[in-house]
């Protein structure tokens, strides 16, 4: 039982590690008609938001299955409504479509924006491809720009009004197989020798 407790503690620690320095600002539900599509959360190192602040993290917890390629198309359409005129949206579309897998309910997608670049993390896996600072600004602007189509979500996302969701919903919950207390024999690697075996072979 002690070994099991230690194993659970280690997994919990490493699952929470990416959030060790992130403080929640706020979160909000995105719905389409009657459907709850995802919950989006905003995080910073201070727990407050200031325009152009870096690092910054946007987190999405999916409630519905979403095709990655279609999600990328939706994001580019939203970026185009911002009329930024300083980014290559077609290149961004290709890069996101090559980066995103399909998303399942309870998947957590994080976008981490640094001063000069940004990247996506799906659950506990860093997705291949870095995006530039212009993409950072455009991606964050989808939800936080004054002319965003998601302006109604901003009061909750910026922590000005209370959300129905807790920040802990964006933490990964490790899947632990049930432990059979009747089976107290640990499984060892195929070539692992116990001390008694080593002595007999010596």
From Swiss-Prot:
Region described as Disordered: spans on this chain: 179-202
A Pfam entry, by short name: Chalcone_3
InterPro entries attached to this UniProt entry: Chalcone_isomerase (IPR016087)
Superkingdom: Bacteria
Name this polypeptide is given: Uncharacterized protein HI_1399
Species this chain originates from: Haemophilus influenzae (strain ATCC 51907 / DSM 11121 / KW20 / Rd)
